[in-house]
């Protein structure tokens, strides 16, 4: 399909459409020159541009006057200066001439058809009489036309042909067009519109007015839809541009078919054309494409995602356009007197083609740039979060490897495409230069079919004086002299219009030559030339953007040392039951590799910058001898994996047990470049955790698998059971009420008065605005929402509440807080303020605090589910009444008796921590993130369950999310990295998933407690043969029936 090509080769498609549109524009412009322009003519005349037209003084014109010869009964034509006329006399006749090849077999009557009713001399058939004269290889055809200098008839110009237009243009170039002329033209246009409207009936006005209103509503609706989809201007403009192109193509097709539609009729049809093409279809296509590209795997090529989205969106769009085209074609065929039906059908055909070609190509480039910008935003966020430039670039490229590659490849396609266009341009010019000797042959070919206007400068300069001397005008002057009803007429010889004979369409060179001539003619127009400059400027901007993408893509990480590859090939993971050890294998490999040099030799080589020549054992010696700092191995060796292996060996040999070097803690096959300057220091390996998955859990109508990294048996299974029960009721519904991360510095003042004044200023609108401006200037992503203050003696605690997009954002907030405090001290008059700490525990971070429970921190989410009573019995093995009673007694009363703050739940921290470890969140923040209150109610025999979590602190950028395993789990949830269209949506979605998962865990654990199955399930799922001593059969049976027997003796249980 065409959309696949447009998505894969967008730049080529745009270039091809641009060429075709330019050709259609030429045809459209040629058609406009044949239309009536009373408004334009009157506006030109108003400013003197057409004064005396066609008697406007033009170059090379001559004025002749018939005078009597003294003493003789005869008269002669004398040339007189134009100034002698003085505006009082008048010119009776204009002699207009056409020059064309002498042997061209054409019907020259077509040249003067517009002047059929104005000619002075007619032949027997009523057509204009020509006066012919051969001049070399050219034929001069002349006619006589009446003209009045004082009052040139405007109606004479309304049927203006290209001949008249060619004479208007020099006058316009000479006088210029000012702003006042444009205002006059607008005013004249408005007056002419009112005149046309006054001649129409009320029904016609109502129909056209309604159509224009609907058109404006459609355009505004399209703009608003594109705004909601994340495009402020360009996609909206592209849709309108595509529609304009379709109208141009349709007009060209209609005129080629012989159907003439006047300019006034086209203006009346414009709103119907806009309404016919259905702009909302373009918005729907855009929505589906953006949705597909937002939720798809970011590593898949962009053009594949767009092609799939277009394939899904195509059927309804094709049905709409097909129905409209068929109906309009039938009406056009039936010929009901409305010839615009043919135009409407043509517009719909071309609009459908351009929608899936030109617009899809524009949309592809837009999304390519958006994906690249998203990757660049990730890199900048990671830098603000404290990562180094190289690590941030590596992580951003790894998160979306296809973006840079695609943008880079797109740049190279642009580069080669530009070279091809430049080559074609040079070839056309060379062809133009080389074809000059053959133009005369082309113009005089016997196969010529019609005449076309030529550029006069390319042909011999025929001057009126020379033609007069050659007797070219003798016949026409004699005919004028013989007319009996005039005395002493004046005649003006106007400069001629040159025509060449067009060759037959079978000549390829003629076609190319004609195209070049037309192109050069129209390209010189001031309007088109300005658009070409704008297009070239836009092209340069796009090329610069893609050049930056290609440059970033060309930056490659330094390849790993060969010694690491050797070690990886030799060292394998060996189970603990094997008698061999990794240490023995490594020592054997080092011994085989080379002989260990003395410490003095190693120090000399190291000081001389030859560290790369040392083997691992020699580097270990240097490190043990304190010549290389343990933390600097990555920087010195330029090889992160080798540095980890050596550090592991050094630590093992320096420790008391000396077991680390030969332990089963893994070290190889891990991307430590993502860890360096990002997650951990002094790395000696990595710690695998069991990773399970619960679900799928339906959250807000979408299924999610919940990744959980934990070492606690029965936790994943319990959460899985809760997911099953929640899904039985239709899934979970979540509401996010707040999204704000906080940092609370502590500042001090000399006395309470100054501290109180600072608090009042910070709480005022002025103070809030100053601090917000200072804070927001430090980051492209962090935005200060509001400030809360608390005073304790002379110490002032300030809580900055900010939004941080998809990042958890603690580091970028700290940078903004520092700068805001500096501005407060230097510019707000609080130079006596002392900053005690950027974090004064008023945040509060990684500590239980009532302020997080009340005001929230991070994302505040409430999740709810309705579990049918039957599902409670069949899945959870308990009853609704028992669950509600247990929740009140345990989670509410029990936590209150313990004086808990935010701990009104069964085990929210269990689920939060497991999900945090799996998705790369900060595990320490489970302290405040686990704030949760679980509520249960019996509603018509069903269980209404909800969890409210006011301080879920999560992010999808930075921290542990840069690691590949954790990033893979974010990919599983579809929330990795920054959201393409709405920053912050990915982290907010992750918070919703956490809340829903906590609700599933709460439901399952409370059910196990209510039914007395907790101990039994843990014994069954939390005992493994590897770490549990053998038991006899009598000991394996849990004694949970004792609880049932106790409860059974209670009345009502």
Swiss-Prot record:
Gene that encodes the chain: hmg1
Lineage top rank: taxon: Eukaryota
Entry function: Part of the first module of ergosterol biosynthesis pathway that includes the early steps of the pathway, conserved across all eukaryotes, and which results in the formation of mevalonate from acetyl-coenzyme A (acetyl-CoA). Hmg1 catalyzes the reduction of hydroxymethylglutaryl-CoA (HMG-CoA) to mevalonate. The first module starts with the action of the cytosolic acetyl-CoA acetyltransferase eg10 that catalyzes the formation of acetoacetyl-CoA. The hydroxymethylglutaryl-CoA synthases erg13 then condenses acetyl-CoA with acetoacetyl-CoA to form HMG-CoA.
Chain positions found as Phosphothreonine: 1028
Active-site feature positions: 712 (charge relay system), 846 (charge relay system), 922 (charge relay system), 1018 (proton donor)
Name used for this protein in its record: 3-hydroxy-3-methylglutaryl-coenzyme A reductase
Location of Phosphoserine modifications: 1024
Catalytic activity: (R)-mevalonate + 2 NADP(+) + CoA = (3S)-3-hydroxy-3-methylglutaryl-CoA + 2 NADPH + 2 H(+)
The enzyme's E.C. designation: 1.1.1.34
Keyword Manganese: no
GO terms under cellular component: endoplasmic reticulum; endoplasmic reticulum membrane; nuclear envelope; nuclear membrane; nuclear outer membrane-endoplasmic reticulum membrane network; peroxisomal membrane
Keywords: Endoplasmic reticulum, Glycoprotein, Lipid biosynthesis, Lipid metabolism, Membrane, NADP, Nucleus, Oxidoreductase, Phosphoprotein, Steroid biosynthesis, Steroid metabolism, Sterol biosynthesis, Sterol metabolism, Transmembrane, Transmembrane helix
A GO molecular function held by the record: hydroxymethylglutaryl-CoA reductase (NADPH) activity
Spans annotated as Disordered: 1028-1053
Residues holding NADP(+): 779-781, 806-814, 1022-1023
Gene Ontology BP terms: coenzyme A metabolic process; ergosterol biosynthetic process; farnesyl diphosphate biosynthetic process, mevalonate pathway; isopentenyl diphosphate biosynthetic process, mevalonate pathway; isoprenoid biosynthetic process
């Amino acid at each position: 399909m065409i959309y696949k090509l447009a998505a894969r080769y967008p730049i080529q498609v745009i270039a091809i459409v641009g060429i075709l549109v330019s050709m259609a524009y030429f045809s459209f412009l040629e058609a406009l020159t044949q239309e009536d322009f009373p408004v334009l003519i009157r506006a030109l005349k108003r400013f003197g541009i057409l004064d005396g037209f066609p008697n406007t003084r033009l170059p090379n014109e001559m004025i002749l006057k018939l005078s009597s010869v003294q003493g003789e009964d005869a008269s002669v034509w004398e040339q007189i200066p134009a100034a002698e006329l003085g505006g009082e006399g008048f010119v009776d006749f204009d002699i207009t001439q056409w020059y064309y090849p002498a042997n061209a077999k054409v019907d020259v009557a077509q040249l003067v058809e517009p002047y059929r009713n104005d000619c002075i001399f007619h032949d027997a058939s009523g057509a204009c009489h020509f006066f012919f004269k051969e001049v070399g290889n050219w034929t001069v055809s002349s006619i006589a036309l009446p003209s009045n200098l004082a009052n040139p008839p405007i109606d004479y110009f309304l049927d203006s042909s290209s001949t008249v237009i060619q004479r208007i243009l020099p006058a316009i170039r000479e006088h210029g067009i000012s702003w006042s002329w444009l205002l006059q033209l607008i005013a004249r246009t408005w007056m002419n519109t009112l005149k046309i409207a006054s001649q129409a009936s009320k029904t016609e006005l109502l129909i056209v007015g309604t159509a224009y209103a609907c058109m404006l509503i459609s355009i505004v609706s399209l703009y608003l839809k594109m705004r909601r989809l994340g495009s402020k201007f360009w996609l909206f403009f592209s849709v309108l541009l595509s529609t304009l192109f379709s109208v141009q193509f349709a007009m060209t097709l209609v005129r080629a078919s012989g159907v003439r539609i006047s300019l006034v009729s086209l203006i009346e049809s414009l709103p119907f054309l806009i309404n016919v093409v259905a702009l909302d279809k373009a918005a729907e296509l855009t929505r589906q494409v953006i949705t597909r590209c937002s939720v798809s795997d970011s590593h898949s090529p962009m053009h594949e995602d767009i092609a799939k989205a277009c394939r899904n969106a195509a059927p309804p769009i094709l049905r709409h356009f097909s129905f409209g085209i068929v109906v309009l074609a039938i009406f056009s065929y039936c010929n009901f007197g409305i010839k615009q039906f043919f135009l409407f059908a043509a517009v719909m055909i071309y609009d459908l083609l351009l929608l899936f070609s030109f617009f899809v190509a524009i949309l592809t480039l837009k999304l390519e740039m958006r994906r690249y910008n998203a990757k660049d935003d990730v890199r900048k966020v990671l830098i603000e979060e404290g990562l180094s430039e190289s690590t941030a670039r590596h992580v951003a490229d790894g998160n979306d490897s296809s973006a840079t590659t695609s943008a880079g490849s797109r740049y190279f396609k642009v580069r080669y495409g530009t070279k091809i266009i430049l080559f074609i341009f040079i070839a056309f010019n060379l062809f133009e230069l080389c074809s000059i000797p053959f133009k005369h042959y082309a113009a005089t070919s016997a196969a010529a079919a019609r005449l076309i206007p030529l550029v006069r400068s390319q042909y011999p300069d025929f001057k009126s004086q020379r033609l007069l001397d050659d007797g070219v005008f003798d016949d026409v002057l004699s005919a004028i002299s013989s007319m009996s009803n005039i005395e002493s007429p004046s005649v003006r010889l106007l400069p001629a219009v040159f025509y060449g004979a067009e060759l037959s369409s079978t000549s390829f060179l003629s076609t190319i030559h004609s195209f070049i001539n037309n192109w050069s003619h129209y390209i010189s127009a001031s309007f088109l030339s300005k658009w070409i400059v704008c297009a070239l400027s836009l092209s340069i901007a796009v090329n610069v953007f893609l050049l930056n993408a290609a440059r970033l893509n060309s930056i490659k990480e330094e390849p790993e040392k060969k010694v690491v590859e050797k070690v990886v090939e030799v060292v394998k993971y060996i189970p603990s039951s094997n008698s061999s050890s990794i240490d023995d294998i490594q020592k054997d490999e080092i011994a085989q590799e080379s002989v260990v040099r003395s410490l003095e030799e190693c120090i000399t080589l190291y000081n001389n910058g030859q560290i790369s020549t040392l083997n691992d054992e020699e580097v270990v010696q240097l490190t043990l001898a304190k010549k290389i700092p343990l933390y600097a191995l990555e920087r010195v060796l330029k090889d992160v994996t080798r540095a980890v292996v050596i550090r592991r060996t050094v630590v093992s040999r320096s420790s008391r047990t000396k077991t680390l070097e030969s332990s089963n803690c893994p070290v190889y096959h891990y991307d430590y470049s993502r860890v360096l300057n990002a997650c951990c220091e002094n790395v000696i390996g990595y710690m695998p955790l069991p990773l399970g998955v619960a679900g799928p859990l339906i959250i807000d109508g979408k299924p999610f698998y919940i990744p959980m990294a934990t070492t606690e048996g029965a936790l994943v299974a319990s959460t899985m059971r809760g997911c099953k029960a929640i899904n039985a009721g239709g899934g979970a519904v979540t509401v996010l009420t707040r999204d704000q991360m906080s940092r609370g510095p502590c500042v001090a003042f000399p006395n309470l008065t100054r501290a109180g004044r600072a608090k009042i200023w910070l709480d005022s609108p002025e103070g809030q605005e100053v601090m917000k401006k200072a804070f927001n200037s430090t980051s492209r992503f962090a935005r200060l929402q509001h400030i809360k203050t608390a005073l304790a003696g002379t110490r002032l605690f300030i809580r900055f509440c900010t939004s941080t997009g998809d990042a958890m954002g603690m580091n970028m907030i700290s940078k903004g807080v520092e700068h805001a405090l500096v501005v407060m001290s230097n510019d707000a008059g609080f130079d006596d303020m002392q900053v005690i700490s950027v974090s004064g525990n008023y945040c509060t971070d990684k500590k239980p605090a009532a302020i997080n429970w009340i005001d929230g921190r991070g994302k505040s989410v409430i999740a709810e589910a309705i579990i049918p009573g039957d599902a409670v019995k069949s899945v959870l093995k308990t009853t609704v009444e028992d669950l509600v009673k247990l929740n009140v007694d345990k989670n509410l009363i029990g936590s209150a008796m313990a004086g808990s703050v935010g701990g009104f739940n069964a085990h929210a921290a269990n689920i939060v921590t497991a999900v945090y470890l799996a998705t790369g969140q900060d595990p320490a923040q489970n302290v405040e993130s686990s704030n949760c209150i679980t509520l249960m109610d019996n509603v018509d025999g069903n269980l209404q369950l909800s969890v409210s979590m006011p301080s879920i602190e999560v992010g999808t950028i930075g921290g542990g999310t840069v690691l590949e395993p954790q990033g893979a789990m974010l990919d599983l949830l579809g929330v990795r990295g920054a959201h393409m269209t709405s920053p912050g949506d990915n982290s907010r979605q992750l918070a919703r998933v956490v809340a829903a998962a906590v609700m599933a865990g709460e439901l399952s654990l409370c059910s196990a407690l209510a039914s007395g199955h907790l101990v039994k399930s843990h014994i069954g799922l939390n005992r493994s043969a590897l770490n549990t001593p053998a038991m006899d059969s009598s000991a394996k049976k849990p004694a949970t029936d004792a609880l049932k027997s106790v409860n059974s003796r209670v009345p009502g249980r």
